[in-house]
């Protein structure tokens, strides 16, 4: 039974850091607590206005067991051999060459951390799942965060075991990749209830002394604020001019179709005396709901973060992620501050960036959530002390056969700090930044496999400090922003500085007087134009009754063959071309009653033999999915498009199998017909809802024209022959080809994305396609509008 004691307490500024300092002085936390456990310190702090996001603050007591991961040697995990530029679509695909290793370590009283055993896994989730046996039994009498769970740091560089891409710039051998404490002792401040609790797996001496100390401290708590940082020298990895040139380089890659959005970050660094003082200044001047402090003395490492962003929240099987994308600085005058907030809400660029991330996070949750459960739930403007942000809430229900480690594997690292499509941008980030990110854009948080409770932030607004044995630390701050085709290079340079400024001031006293401060608030995105009105309508549409869908199946060469479908059933072969929206299409089709078989279209596991693939799966329908780059990067998609136009994609009765290409798949069909593929003459358009003119075609049955659909593309097909007919164009110019069809065969392509939150009736296109087959006649199926909830 968990030992627990609780006291009433009010909510005051500086409460948690002051309490942690007091427990240090008593020898109950940190380097002076060696008789009770290790010297590692962890504080997960929620500050700012009390809300669902900012409620609990938790201080970990001295740990007895921890697990750590270090960068393998270059012999085990070599850097990728360059075969070209990711900015030109040449990505080193493939899994890691070494296992993801974690060391289980135990504290020897008053001494040091000793290694017990090393656990290996092929990816991050499988390695961490092997640690579940270390946890004590759960106390069924308690709810919420309990002692005995895992909590700590996952650096961005663990991406080596979460994404199928090989990197050129790896951390040095032995560098800390991850550290999770088994937290057997918690001090928890429940801000909404006004209580502070001490919880421990044992009613021991530490528990007694901690309770006694807190009782005495609460009589006259000392919460003095930290003095301002002294001004000191600061270095940047690049000049503003170089940063501006990188923005232009990314814009060219987007124009060429390699990706839609990329998050680039630059680094500032300098010597500092006390990372803990930096953290106290940060939480005082920039309170945020997902702040945190970590100290690991044997690695000479500290981390201070005031992150406002949530990667993953889990309660039982309910998952939530809250991507942030879209930023404006605060202003000193109220009028100018409100104008900047409205400017943010009215910006086509900022809205498009944000919608890309909403669709991306729906996709990532879709990898592990039950079909029909993923939805865009909320959209708002959050005003923090120095910036305004656009924030959404995307939710889903975890599948019964998966756990929180699987959910973390699917979402880590967050899409808002990589880009879209995710795998392609991770490769390009590695090329452009040319250095490992370490903790920045990784995650700090906790997970309890026993209760299914988890919360992981995204480590933005963070400072890392290393090498402080003599009090001389090297601190590092990284900040940047999402780059899209419409980005202005000078504005992007300034935005990176806004985001870094509060940290630079707290650490090095760089320019305190220049930072406007404002009150924190959360408000709905105002209805300023027809685009926002349409998105709000989509967000607030009530879901309809969903049929009972089958979960999608990921199939690889060598897996068991399928038996033929029964009369009237539909089996969809979906070719996944490494896009970050693929699972939205997969879920949409599964909701419509199709059995969806997912096959990789790029990379090591892509099937090269088309006829063997078709005979093994025996599909009734095929979708060639979207993806980064050009169709030439996707050989399987090219082959299927070519054979479909020849009438050689047929079922066992020699009837043609209906085939639909979406975005890149649409372009592959156009190229197979001999049409030209070239950059759009009107420029790249990503994350923007645009009106489309539809012709009278079965693919658009029961749909009005014009119709708003979401565009994500830089390239466009240009007709050069009559093998295909144009069935959709953009309403603005009526010249850009947005839909094609073969006049005699069941082959279609659409350039836009029907599965997006910005395509309110796009599901009807998927439905119309799936009811097109000799073996699948019948009434159309009603389904929920994809990814939305009222």
Language model: regions and residue ranges:
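Flexible loop residues that form catalytic
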Residues: 267-268, 468, 627, 745, ...
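Flexible gly/pro-rich beta->alpha loop and the following alpha-helix that scaffold active-site loops
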Residues: 571-575, 579-662, 667, 673, ...
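Pocket-forming structural segment of enzyme catalytic cores
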Residues: 639-662, 667-764, 768-772
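Extended alpha-helical targeting/anchoring segments
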Residues: 1-543, 549-550, 554-559
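A short, charged/proline- and glycine-enriched loop
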Residues: 564-571
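Short, solvent-exposed loop/turn segments that connect beta-strands within catalytic domains
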Residues: 74-76, 468-473, 652-655, 734, ...
């Amino acid at each position: 039974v968990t030992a627990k004691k609780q006291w009433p307490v009010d909510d005051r500024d500086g409460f948690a850091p002051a309490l942690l300092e007091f427990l240090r002085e008593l020898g109950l936390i940190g380097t002076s607590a060696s008789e009770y456990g290790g010297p590692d310190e962890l504080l997960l702090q929620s500050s700012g206005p009390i809300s669902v996001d900012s409620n609990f603050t938790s201080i970990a007591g001295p740990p007895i067991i921890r697990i750590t991961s270090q960068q393998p040697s270059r012999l085990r995990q070599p850097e990728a051999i360059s075969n070209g530029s990711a900015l030109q679509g040449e990505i080193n695909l493939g899994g890691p060459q070494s296992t993801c290793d974690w060391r289980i370590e135990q504290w020897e009283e008053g001494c040091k951390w000793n290694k017990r055993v090393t656990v290996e896994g092929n990816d991050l989730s499988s390695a961490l799942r092997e640690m579940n046996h270390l946890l004590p039994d759960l106390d069924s009498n308690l709810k919420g965060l309990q002692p005995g769970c895992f909590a700590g740091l996952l650096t961005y560089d663990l991406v080596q075991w979460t994404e199928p891409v090989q990197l050129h710039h790896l951390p040095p051998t032995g560098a800390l990749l991850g550290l999770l404490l088994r937290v057997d002792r918690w001090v928890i401040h429940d801000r909404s209830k006004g209580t502070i609790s001490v919880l421990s797996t044992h009613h021991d001496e530490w528990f007694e002394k901690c309770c006694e100390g807190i009782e005495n401290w609460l009589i006259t708590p000392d919460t003095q604020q930290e003095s301002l940082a002294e001004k000191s020298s600061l270095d940047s990895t690049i000049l503003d001019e170089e940063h501006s040139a990188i923005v232009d380089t990314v814009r060219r890659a987007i124009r060429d179709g390699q990706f839609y959005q990329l998050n680039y970050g630059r680094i500032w660094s300098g010597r500092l005396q006390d990372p803990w003082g930096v953290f106290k200044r940060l939480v005082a001047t920039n309170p945020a709901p997902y702040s945190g402090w970590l100290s690991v003395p044997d690695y000479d490492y500290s981390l201070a973060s005031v992150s406002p962003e949530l990667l993953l929240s889990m309660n039982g099987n309910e998952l939530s992620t809250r991507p942030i994308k879209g930023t404006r600085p605060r202003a000193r005058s109220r009028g100018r501050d409100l104008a900047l907030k409205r400017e943010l809400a009215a910006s086509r660029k900022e809205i498009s960036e944000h919608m890309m991330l909403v669709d991306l996070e729906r996709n990532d949750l879709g990898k592990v959530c039950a079909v029909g459960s993923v939805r865009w739930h909320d959209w708002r403007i959050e005003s923090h002390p120095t910036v305004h942000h656009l924030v959404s809430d995307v939710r889903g229900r975890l599948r019964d056969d998966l756990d929180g480690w699987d959910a973390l594997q699917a979402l880590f690292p967050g899409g808002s700090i990589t880009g879209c499509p995710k795998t392609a941008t991770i490769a390009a980030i590695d090329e452009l930044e040319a250095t490992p990110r370490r903790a920045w854009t990784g995650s700090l948080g906790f997970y309890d496999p026993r209760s299914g409770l988890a919360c992981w932030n995204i480590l933005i607004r963070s400072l890392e400090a290393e090498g402080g044995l003599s009090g001389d630390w090297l601190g590092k701050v990284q900040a940047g922003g999402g780059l899209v085709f419409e980005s202005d290079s000078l504005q992007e340079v300034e935005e990176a500085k806004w985001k870094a400024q509060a940290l630079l001031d707290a650490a090095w006293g760089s320019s305190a007087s220049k930072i406007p401060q404002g009150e924190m608030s959360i408000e709905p995105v105002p209805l300023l134009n027809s685009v926002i009105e349409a998105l709000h309508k989509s967000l607030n549409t009530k879901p309809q009754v969903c049929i009972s869908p089958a979960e999608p199946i990921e199939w690889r060469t060598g897996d068991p063959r399928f038996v033929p479908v029964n009369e009237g059933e539909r089996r969809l072969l979906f070719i996944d071309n490494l896009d970050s929206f693929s699972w939205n299409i997969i879920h949409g089709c599964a909701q419509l009653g199709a059995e969806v078989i997912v096959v990789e279209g790029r990379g090591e596991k892509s099937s090269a033999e088309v006829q063997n693939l078709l005979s093994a799966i025996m599909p009734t329908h095929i979708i060639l999915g979207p993806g980064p780059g050009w169709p030439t990067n996707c050989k399987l998609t090219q082959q299927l498009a070519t054979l479909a136009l020849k009438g050689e994609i047929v079922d066992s009765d020699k009837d043609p199998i209906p085939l639909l290409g979406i975005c890149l798949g649409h372009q592959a069909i156009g190229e197979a017909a001999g049409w030209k593929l070239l950059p759009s003459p009107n420029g790249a358009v990503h994350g923007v809802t645009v009106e489309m003119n539809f012709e009278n075609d079965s693919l658009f049955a029961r749909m009005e024209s014009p119709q708003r659909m979401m565009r994500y593309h830089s390239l466009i097909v240009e007709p050069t022959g009559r093998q295909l007919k144009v069935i959709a164009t953009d309403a603005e110019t009526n010249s850009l080809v947005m839909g094609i069809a073969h006049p005699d065969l069941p082959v279609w392509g659409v350039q836009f994305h029907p599965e997006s939150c910005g395509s309110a009736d796009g599901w009807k296109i998927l439905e119309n396609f799936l009811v097109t087959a000799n073996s699948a006649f019948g009434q159309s199926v009603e389904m929920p509008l994809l990814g939305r909830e009222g």
